[in-house]
């Protein structure tokens, strides 16, 4: 037996909950929305090509396994109304994946104050000879908060054999950071590795 909470979604990707049941969720090719406890859905932030959002970020796009993915809630949300959203961006060449920090309005009708606290996670620009090997493949990426209030961010290997063991390229990793995107205290990566690195050598972490 099951209860349908929402339907007619397009590629729903992630959810994050407040204690009162408020649910932030992403649709990979549409954007960020929130389901309120009373059942009302507020669209918050769209991306290139999406419609029905009060604001959109034109650099955010969807291709293959890439798009708007992980979402997490700041441990001090009651005070700062911050959330974190991981999305693919064409703001730079080559394109990258970015972890954005956003501020939710008091009435949960909009977001503002975008700050990209991570902007250097690789994105697969071209197709390769792999199963499902098109652009955007093996792109990660989940965001979660640990008990100490730090952020975990998971990234994919882009079908690129150089990424898993690279000390400086942030694909194929789990990153652990504070809420400003800096390396979290207690990280112990091997010498020469980016200090945000928590674990490395992964295929396409999404859990």
Describe the function of each predicted region:
Residues 115, 141, 172-173, 196:
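Extracytoplasmic/periplasmic beta-strand context in beta-sandwich domains
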Residues 194-207:
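Repeat-solenoid scaffold signature
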Residues 97-107, 167-180:
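Beta-propeller blade signature
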Residues 1, 108-111, 180-191:
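Blade/loop signatures of beta-propeller domains
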Residues 1-162, 207:
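Acidic, Gly/Ser/Thr-rich repeat motifs that build Ca2+-stabilized beta-propeller blades
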Residues 159, 189-195:
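Short, well-ordered junction/capping motifs at the entry into regular secondary structure
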Residues 144-151, 171, 176-185:
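A structural motif
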Residues 64, 136, 167-170, 198-201:
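Short, conserved glycine- and acidic-residue-centered signature motifs
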């Amino acid at each position: 037996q099951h209860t349908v909470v929402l339907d007619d979604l397009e590629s729903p990707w992630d959810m994050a909950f407040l204690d009162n049941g408020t649910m932030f969720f992403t649709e990979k090719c549409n954007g960020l929305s929130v389901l309120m406890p009373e059942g009302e859905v507020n669209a918050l932030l769209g991306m290139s090509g999406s419609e029905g959002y009060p604001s959109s970020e034109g650099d955010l796009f969807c291709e293959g396994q890439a798009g708007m993915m992980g979402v997490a809630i700041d441990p001090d949300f009651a005070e700062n109304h911050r959330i974190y959203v991981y999305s693919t961006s064409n703001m730079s060449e080559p394109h990258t994946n970015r972890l954005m920090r956003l501020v939710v309005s008091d009435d949960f009708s909009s977001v503002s104050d975008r700050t990209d606290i991570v902007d250097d996670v690789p994105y697969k620009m071209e197709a390769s000879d792999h199963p499902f090997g098109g652009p955007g493949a093996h792109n990660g990426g989940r965001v979660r908060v640990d008990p100490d209030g730090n952020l975990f961010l998971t990234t994919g290997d882009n079908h690129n054999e150089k990424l898993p063991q690279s000390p400086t390229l942030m694909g194929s990793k789990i990153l652990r950071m504070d809420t400003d995107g800096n390396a979290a205290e207690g990280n112990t990566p091997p010498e020469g590795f980016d200090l945000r690195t928590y674990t490395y050598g992964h295929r396409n972490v999404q859990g």
